[in-house]
A protein has these predicted regions:
Chain B
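Short, surface-exposed acidic/glycine-rich loop or hinge patches that mediate macromolecular interfaces
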Residues: 94-97, 147, 233, 257, ...
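ABC transporter nucleotide-binding domains
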Residues: 28-229, 235
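Short acidic active-site motifs
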Residues: 99, 238, 288-289
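Short, charged/small-residue-rich alpha-helical element at the C-terminal edge
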Residues: 248-319
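ABC transporter nucleotide-binding domain
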Residues: 195-280
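ABC-family P-loop ATPase nucleotide-binding domain
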Residues: 1-37, 318-327
C-alpha cells in the first residue's frame, strides 16, 4: 500500500525543485561575493557587536566555511528551510480534512496510521533533493572560485540537518492533526518554529538563561560548529530524531482518535 | 410493449429477477444500524437511528438538507465516531477501525462533497484509487459516465466531478455502495443513466445505500426508504407504501369556476382554489381521479409527486416522535 506515498511524494516535487533553485541562486550569489569581501571580513567582525554573532552563531567569517555557515546555513537553512518543513508538515493532514479529500482517502482499505506515515514518508522528496542538490552546488561553487571546501564537513552539515528539519515538520504535523483549518495550522507552525529558533539564539546571549534554549530544536544543530570546527554532534542529532519520532507517534495517536 | 406510466416503478418487477447471482437473496443485513447517535455539543445530528439494509436492495435515505443523512453515512464509514449506539457494515463494527478498514475494499463511497486532488487529471485520480482497491470495472463505467479524463480535475464542472466520483465509487466492483446525494449536479440524462445503472447493480446482487433529498428520485429507484428528519428516523417502509400514503400533488385548471362542493371529493386534501385553478393533494386511486375530472371542463391538469415536506406534514404530523414501525 504505497498509493498515498506515491501521490504525496509527487506533490512535494514542485516545492523541492523551487527551493533547490533558490539555494543554487543564493550560493552563486554568496560565492561570487566572497573573493571580493574576504579581506574585509575582519573589519566586518570588529564593526558589529559580538551579540550579533552570538545570536546567529557566526564566527570565522574570513574562511569559506565560516562565511558559508553564516550566510547560507545559519539563516536560510536553519530558519527558512525549517519554516518550510513546518509549513509542509502542517498541511499534510489539515488540508485534506478541510477539503474533504480525507473522506475519499479513508474510504479505501487504508488505515489512518498508514495515511499519516505515508504522508510523513513523502518528506523524503525535499529531504533528499535539498541535501543532495545543495551540497553539490556549494562544493562546485567553492571550487569555481578557487576555494576548497571540506567535503566531509559539508556532507555532515546536511546529514545532521535532516533530523532538525524533520522535527520542524513534526511540529507542523502535530498541529495538522489537531487543528481543522489548514491556514491556522500552517500559521501556528511557522510562528512556533520561528519563535523556537529565536529563543535558542537569544538565550545563548546570557549564560544564566541559556538552558531555556534547550527546548528549541535548533539548539541541537549547530552549522558553524560542523563547518568551522568539524564537530559532529551525533548525540544531538539522535535527540532530534527521537523527538521527531515522538511527534509522529503523537500525531498518529491523535489522528486515529478524532472525528474528521 | 407494456404501458409506460409514471407509476410504473421498475422496483416492482425485480421480485422475479433472472439474474445469474442466486446467492444475493435479500434479507441478510449488509448494513445494520442500532441506536446510532451523534451529538455535537447540544446539537444531536443523529438520534438513536436504527434500521437495517438488506443484501441486494436499493435503500433510499431520504430527508431534507441538514436532517442528518451525511452524518449517518460518515458514521458508517468510520470518519466520525458515534456518541452512542453502533452499526455494522458488511459485518464490521464501525467502532472497530481495523475490521472496518478491511471491509472497505468491498465498499464504494460517493461523498456529497467530492474532495479530489484537484491538480491531478481524472485518469491520475482513478489510478490513485485503483492502487488501493482495484479497478476491474473502470472501462465499463467510463462508457456510461464520461468525465474528461485527461483534464485536470480543477477544470471540471460539477457534473464531471460527480461522474468521476461515480466511476471511482464503483470501479472496484464493491458489494456495497454508499452514495451521498449521488445525482446532484448531473444533468437529467445522466441522472437517468445513473438510476438505470443502480437498478442493474441491484439486480446483480449489489446493495446500494443512497441518500437524497429528492423524493421523486428515491421513488424511482429505491425499494425501501428511511426518512430522517432532525436527526431522527421518522419512517421506514417500502417505497410503495410510502407513495400510497404520500398521494399526488394535483393542479387542475378549469374552463370556468365550479362549485367547490361539487368538485372536491374526500380523497382531496389541502384544497386551494383560486378562480379556475384548483390545487390539492390526492390520496386516492389515480383512475378514480381521472374519472372524476372528466366530468368537468378541464383546460389543463398537472399531476406530480408531493413534496417531501408535505408528506411529513400530512402523514407524520409535526410531532418529532418516531413512528411505530421503525425497526
Amino acid at each position: 500500500m504505497t498509493a498515498v506515498l506515491r501521490l504525496e511524494s509527487r506533490k512535494r516535487v514542485r516545492g523541492s525543485v523551487i527551493l533547490l533553485v533558490v539555494f543554487a541562486l543564493l550560493s552563486a550569489l554568496y560565492f561570487s561575493m566572497f573573493p571580493g569581501i574576504q579581506a574585509e571580513m575582519d573589519a566586518f567582525e570588529e564593526a558589529f557587536p559580538e551579540y550579533m554573532f552570538d545570536l546567529f552563531g557566526i564566527e570565522a567569517l574570513h574562511t569559506i566555511e565560516g562565511f558559508v555557515a553564516a550566510e547560507l546555513y545559519a539563516f536560510f537553512w536553519s530558519l527558512l528551510l525549517a519554516i518550510y518543513f513546518a509549513y509542509v508538515g502542517a498541511g499534510l493532514i489539515a488540508g485534506d480534512v478541510q477539503d474533504r479529500r480525507m473522506d475519499l482517502t479513508l474510504s479505501n482499505p487504508v488505515s489512518r496510521e498508514s495515511v499519516v506515515l505515508q504522508k510523513v514518508a513523502a518528506l523524503w522528496v525535499p529531504v533528499v533533493a535539498l541535501n543532495v542538490g545543495v551540497p553539490i552546488v556549494v562544493y562546485v561553487a567553492a571550487l569555481a572560485i578557487g576555494e576548497s571546501f571540506d567535503p566531509v564537513a559539508l556532507a555532515m552539515v546536511h546529514l545532521l540537518s535532516i533530523p532538525y528539519l524533520l522535527v520542524c515538520a513534526g511540529i507542523g504535523l502535530v498541529l495538522s492533526v489537531f487543528v481543522d483549518h489548514v491556514r491556522i495550522a500552517r500559521g501556528t507552525a511557522l510562528v512556533l518554529v520561528f519563535l523556537l529558533w529565536l529563543v535558542d539564539g537569544v538565550s545563548r546571549l546570557d549564560p544564566d538563561y541559556e538552558w531555556i534554549g534547550d527546548l528549541a530544536p535548533s539548539r541541537y544543530y549547530d552549522e558553524t560548529a560542523i563547518l568551522v570546527h568539524e564537530e559532529y554532534a551525533f548525540g544531538d542529532a539522535g535527540i532530534l530524531l527521537a523527538a521527531f519520532l515522538v511527534l509522529v507517534a503523537v500525531s498518529v495517536v491523535i489522528f486515529t482518535r478524532r472525528d474528521i | 410493449m407494456r404501458p409506460q406510466t409514471d407509476a410504473d416503478d421498475p422496483a416492482a418487477e425485480t421480485g422475479s429477477t433472472t439474474e445469474s447471482d442466486p446467492e444475493s437473496a435479500r434479507g441478510s443485513a449488509v448494513i445494520s444500524i442500532d441506536g446510532l447517535t451523534k451529538r455535537y455539543g447540544d446539537v444531536t445530528a443523529n438520534d438513536g437511528v436504527t434500521f437495517d439494509v438488506g443484501a441486494g436492495e436499493i435503500f433510499g435515505y431520504l430527508g431534507p438538507n441538514g436532517a442528518g443523512k451525511t452524518t449517518t453515512i460518515r458514521l458508517l464509514l468510520g470518519l466520525i465516531k458515534p456518541t452512542a449506539g453502533t452499526a455494522t457494515v458488511l459485518g464490521a463494527d464501525v467502532r472497530d477501525r481495523r475490521a472496518l478498514t478491511e471491509v472497505k475494499s468491498d465498499v464504494g463511497y460517493l461523498p456529497d462533497t467530492l474532495g479530489f486532488e484537484d491538480r491531478l487529471t481524472g485518469r491520475q485520480a482513478l489510478d490513485y484509487f485503483a492502487r488501493m482497491r482495484g479497478d476491474e470495472r473502470r472501462e465499463e463505467l467510463l462508457e456510461l459516465f464520461r468525465p474528461p479524463l485527461d483534464k485536470r480535475i480543477e477544470t471540471y464542472s460539477s457534473g464531471n466531478r460527480r461522474m468521476l466520483g461515480i466511476v471511482q465509487a464503483f470501479m472496484h466492483d464493491p458489494q456495497l455502495a454508499i452514495l451521498d446525494e449521488p445525482t446532484s449536479g448531473l444533468d437529467p440524462l445522466k441522472q437517468d443513466r445513473m438510476h438505470a445503472f443502480l437498478e442493474a447493480e441491484r439486480d446483480a446482487g449489489k446493495t446500494i445505500f443512497f441518500s437524497s433529498h429528492v423524493l421523486s428520485e428515491v421513488q424511482r429507484v429505491c425499494d425501501r426508504v428511511g426518512i430522517i428528519r432532525d436527526g431522527e428516523l421518522v419512517a421506514l417502509e417500502d417505497i410503495d407504501d410510502l407513495l400510497e400514503r404520500g398521494g399526488k400533488d394535483v393542479r387542475v385548471e378549469l374552463a370556468e369556476s365550479v362549485d367547490e362542493d361539487a368538485f372536491v371529493t374526500s380523497e382531496m386534501i389541502d384544497v386551494e382554489s383560486v378562480e379556475g385553478t384548483v390545487r390539492f393533494t390526492y390520496t386516492g386511486e389515480a383512475g378514480a381521479l381521472l374519472e372524476h375530472l372528466v366530468r368537468f371542463e378541464v383546460v389543463d391538469v398537472e399531476i406530480g409527486d408531493p413534496q417531501l415536506d408535505d408528506i411529513f406534514k400530512h402523514y407524520y404530523g409535526d410531532e418529532r416522535e418516531p413512528l411505530p414501525g421503525d425497526g
